[in-house]
């Protein structure tokens, strides 16, 4: 690679992301990946199927993605495209199409117009870019967006569910497990299939559990109940709680409220299984730091390091027993601290310096298997 090519790669790597994703959104919008699933096609045929007025534009768009391994173009017959493992992932046969469409939504671009203002003011300004005071309002005002979000999260869960369930070891003494913010109950339903003596509760908001659309999509299992409520007020009593990608959506203050409510309802010797990213300062992944900025700009929330998780849990009377780093997001197993000197109603007295000192002497067991 010449010096010029290296320079251009450096430049394009930093400045073309928004254009690149807009081109990719066009690929998804017209389901071009789907059209290649049954065999190679010439761009002229693809243009005709979709109804493009200028077939050369279709060719140029598809050609753009050849270096990114989204499509293959024949060297024998120029313009003949075939699928790749990547294009299949973004087709109806894959698991990334809904996730791709979700992240390419227009307002996701607009939200980041106010990133400089977020930094200047010290509070996220993302929702104001689309005329909202909170990003969660978007789920109340746009039914199609809410449905796309739930489809995307279901696909995301399908990517990790088998691995995650294999890591969740439930005590034979557990009778009830609650999935907090479990959407349509896909995860807890699958967990019940491999744990025949457990009863499950899928706990989420009223408009998610009981809407006409949701009732058709809710996972059905004889030992599973779908219960609506607000985890900022209370949660159902249980021996075990699962929180998959929930706490990273909220500030420390909001997380404290959620965890305190769980602490009140967790039965003796109970456990929490927290599936969330754990930032590693010695090895930041692109996924982790990207999602951290998303959480900041969308929700005034964040991804957390192991020290930050420790501090958060200890504020609410919990401790980390182990962290499984063999899956991502990581799986933390959390239990109550057996101590009488923790005042759950006065988290403002928490002293981070004391916790930092404790961390030096009592880090959790890290499991990598």
UniProtKB/Swiss-Prot annotation:
<dbReference type="InterPro" id="IPR029063">
    <property type="entry name" value="SAM-dependent_MTases_sf"/>
</dbReference>
<dbReference type="GO" id="GO:0009058">
    <property type="term" value="P:biosynthetic process"/>
</dbReference>
<dbReference type="InterPro" id="IPR001077">
    <property type="entry name" value="O_MeTrfase_dom"/>
</dbReference>
<comment type="function">
    <text>S-adenosyl-L-methionine dependent O-methyltransferase that may be involved in modifying resorcinol ring to synthesize a variant of 4-methyl-5-pentylbenzene-1,3-diol.</text>
</comment>
<dbReference type="GO" id="GO:0008171">
    <property type="term" value="F:O-methyltransferase activity"/>
</dbReference>
<feature type="binding site">
    <location>
        <position position="231"/>
    </location>
    <ligand>
        <name>S-adenosyl-L-methionine</name>
    </ligand>
</feature>
<dbReference type="GO" id="GO:0032259">
    <property type="term" value="P:methylation"/>
</dbReference>
<keyword id="KW-0949">S-adenosyl-L-methionine</keyword>
<dbReference type="InterPro" id="IPR036388">
    <property type="entry name" value="WH-like_DNA-bd_sf"/>
</dbReference>
<keyword id="KW-0489">Methyltransferase</keyword>
<keyword id="KW-0808">Transferase</keyword>
<comment type="similarity">
    <text>Belongs to the class I-like SAM-binding methyltransferase superfamily. Cation-independent O-methyltransferase family. COMT subfamily.</text>
</comment>
<dbReference type="GO" id="GO:0008168">
    <property type="term" value="F:methyltransferase activity"/>
</dbReference>
<feature type="binding site">
    <location>
        <position position="181"/>
    </location>
    <ligand>
        <name>S-adenosyl-L-methionine</name>
    </ligand>
</feature>
<dbReference type="InterPro" id="IPR036390">
    <property type="entry name" value="WH_DNA-bd_sf"/>
</dbReference>
<dbReference type="GO" id="GO:0008757">
    <property type="term" value="F:S-adenosylmethionine-dependent methyltransferase activity"/>
</dbReference>
<dbReference type="Pfam" id="PF00891">
    <property type="entry name" value="Methyltransf_2"/>
</dbReference>
<feature type="binding site">
    <location>
        <begin position="229"/>
        <end position="231"/>
    </location>
    <ligand>
        <name>S-adenosyl-L-methionine</name>
    </ligand>
</feature>
<feature type="active site" description="Proton acceptor">
    <location>
        <position position="248"/>
    </location>
</feature>
<protein>
    <recommendedName>
        <fullName>O-methyltransferase 12</fullName>
        <ecNumber>2.1.1.-</ecNumber>
    </recommendedName>
</protein>
<dbReference type="InterPro" id="IPR016461">
    <property type="entry name" value="COMT-like"/>
</dbReference>
<feature type="binding site">
    <location>
        <position position="230"/>
    </location>
    <ligand>
        <name>S-adenosyl-L-methionine</name>
    </ligand>
</feature>
<feature type="binding site">
    <location>
        <position position="244"/>
    </location>
    <ligand>
        <name>S-adenosyl-L-methionine</name>
    </ligand>
</feature>
<feature type="binding site">
    <location>
        <position position="204"/>
    </location>
    <ligand>
        <name>S-adenosyl-L-methionine</name>
    </ligand>
</feature>
